[in-house]
């Protein structure tokens, strides 16, 4: 049971140990930085509003669905 799980799990850990050292290629990094944001990032825009309410009490800033 557990011995078999360890024998199958250990090679996966050995393959994944260097994943953090991998870097993106230069061309992929340039493409990601050059493209404008798409989708939800375009739809959600912050609007400037006074943070205090009409009665002077502080309130939370508006959310994306206000």
Curated annotation (Swiss-Prot):
Source organism, top-level taxon: Eukaryota
Membrane topology annotation: Multi-pass membrane protein
UniProt keyword Transcription, yes or no: no
Keyword tags: Cytoplasmic vesicle, Membrane, Neurotransmitter transport, Synapse, Transmembrane, Transmembrane helix, Transport
TM annotation in the entry: 1-15
Subcellular location: Cytoplasmic vesicle, Secretory vesicle, Synaptic vesicle membrane
Role, per record: Electrogenic antiporter that exchanges one cholinergic neurotransmitter, acetylcholine or choline, with two intravesicular protons across the membrane of synaptic vesicles. Uses the electrochemical proton gradient established by the V-type proton-pump ATPase to store neurotransmitters inside the vesicles prior to their release via exocytosis. Determines cholinergic vesicular quantal size at presynaptic nerve terminals in developing neuro-muscular junctions with an impact on motor neuron differentiation and innervation pattern.
Annotated protein name in UniProt: Vesicular acetylcholine transporter
């Amino acid at each position: 049971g557990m011995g078999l799980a360890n024998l199958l799990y250990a090679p996966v850990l050995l393959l994944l140990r260097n994943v953090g050292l991998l870097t993106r290629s230069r061309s992929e990094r340039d493409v990601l930085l050059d493209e404008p944001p798409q989708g939800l990032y375009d739809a959600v825009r912050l609007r400037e509003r006074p943070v205090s309410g009409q009665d002077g009490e502080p309130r939370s800033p508006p959310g994306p669905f206000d």
